[in-house]
């Protein structure tokens, strides 16, 4: 089976700074991959290259068998910031891309109804974003991304600004949507528990310059539940990922984290 996303010797330089050094990674169709690593290791840079928002200095990235040369409708992007249009209602935000594409009002309504229901926002369809909590705004952003029917979702720390309980709820909402439609997901996070809970595989990136350090499989069944979070199997994988990330930290960061 051909990978859905392929990073082939991807290099990214900013002036004299090497942000990514020969990144090689394949992500399968329908796979949910999380990417972790120390700050500055190039996680977001890799995602922005996959989104077509940045052009690599070397190498290439393929979606299917086509090189990525810019943004495309087969890739939906969700950032930490909610990026909703404040003057549009929740439904209008979800339907925005469909409207731009010239889809009929009836078809747009059918699609927005489906995805608003999927993320639990049916009762807020006519509300403006200012009336929503942070978690609800991000659910709206997820519904909008899904409504555009991308084959791939690229998510850059989408839950980082949420409180702990809302974050857990959003993880479950996202997994529920993913389990129904099996889009390919590349999810950037600094949260090791989140990385393990969501993923089929956890990609650990090495520090400065960014490159692939190791891939850790998450052999836990779906649907993921609170019981899985509390299981010894989860703890074992979490500890493996945590140690992999911790040992990528620069020595000065490790010392400061111990109060030295």
Swiss-Prot record:
Q: Does the keyword DNA damage apply?
A: no
Q: Which GO terms describe its cellular component?
A: plasma membrane
Binding residues annotated for ATP, in chain numbering: 37-44
The ABC transporter domain covers: 5-228
Q: Which domain of life is it from?
A: Bacteria
Q: Does the keyword NADP apply?
A: no
Q: What is its EC number?
A: 7.-.-.-
Q: Which SUPFAM superfamilies does the protein's record reference?
A: P-loop containing nucleoside triphosphate hydrolases (SSF52540)
Family matches, as Gene3D superfamilies: P-loop containing nucleotide triphosphate hydrolases
Quote the subcellular location field of this record: Cell inner membrane
Tell me the GO molecular function terms.
Answer: ATP binding; ATP hydrolysis activity
Keywords in UniProt for this one?
ATP-binding, Cell inner membrane, Cell membrane, Membrane, Nucleotide-binding, Translocase, Transport
Tell me which SMART domains the record gives: AAA
Which topology term describes how it sits in the membrane?
Peripheral membrane protein
**Where exactly are the transmembrane stretches of this chain?**
none
Q: What binding partners and quaternary form does the record give?
A: The complex is composed of two ATP-binding proteins (BruAb2_1123), two transmembrane proteins (BruAb2_1124) and a solute-binding protein (BruAb2_1122).
Q: What does this protein do?
A: Probably part of an ABC transporter complex. Probably Responsible for energy coupling to the transport system.
Q: Give the family per the record.
A: Belongs to the ABC transporter superfamily.
> What is the protein name for this chain?
Putative ATP-binding protein BruAb2_1123
Species source reads: Brucella abortus biovar 1 (strain 9-941)
